[in-house]
Amino acid sequence: MRDTGVKSLSRDDVLKYSQTVCDGLRDDDDGVRREVLAHAGNRWSLGVIHTLGVYGQLRHAEIGRRMHGVTQRMLTRTLRHLERDGLVVRHDFEEVIPHVEYALSETGLELLVRMVPLWTWIVENVDSFRAARTTFDRKHRNGKP
């Protein structure tokens, strides 16, 4: 196993811990854990969480401008899921021109903090991913294994 910086855990310890977490997901009677994992772990949700973490409280359109490729419909759905799961807070401003802004909740901020090591790991290992893809593509050229 490659050195991950977690010297106190053996491979078996990591596997046992991973199994415990997976068992917790499996034992989720009402499906909330799995649903939150699916919502919070998808491309657009992570983008919203990152955007609100970096820029703070924003309007819907401002979030959309900072997230390349997201449609208005997908952004609306994503914000609703994140709000329902308690990761994002919606602020309604009843002014002369009413508007809505979104911000990370404390739980959303905690998710952002926990995602940074994964994003860092991905950035640090991008050359390994590229090399693996090149090797795989070379071996499987023209659909042949």
Q: What spans do the regions from the language model cover?
A:
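Generic recognition of well-ordered alpha-helical segments
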Residues: 65, 77, 117-120
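Amphipathic alpha-helical dimerization/coiled-coil segments
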Residues: 4-20, 27, 106-109, 113-145
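N-terminal helix-turn-helix DNA-binding core of bacterial DNA-binding proteins
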Residues: 22-74, 101
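Beta-hairpin "wing" of winged helix-turn-helix
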Residues: 83-103
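Basic amphipathic alpha-helical segments that dock to polyanions
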Residues: 75, 79-85
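Solvent-exposed, amphipathic alpha-helical segments
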Residues: 47, 51, 87, 107, ...
